[in-house]
């Protein structure tokens, strides 16, 4: 009986630790326009996303591609870390060794003839800032 109890306890702890892991991906949205500045609606578009280290022209530490469908407003939504990996791994990015920049390239015709649409510095979200502060708090004395 004791072995069964121990086994169940270990199983619960293992499963709980798996679910406690933060996903190694993050959301991204963009509005897609063609060369004539018209919205690309309800269409498949090709997207290449690169995480650059150091500057807007830094080394690409992670690159992936997606083919996604825009909605009626030209909006595309994807999860970076869930595409077809071309280079690197999200899990291996040393986020403490930044800054990092997100470069997006889009082919509004759904292929791989990408044009750079944006390169922006990746900044903290309030959730991450809160987590950083929580890590500084010492143990409570009971």
Predicted regions located by residue number:
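Family-positioned intrinsically disordered, low-complexity linker/tail segments enriched in G/S/T/P
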Residues: 3-139
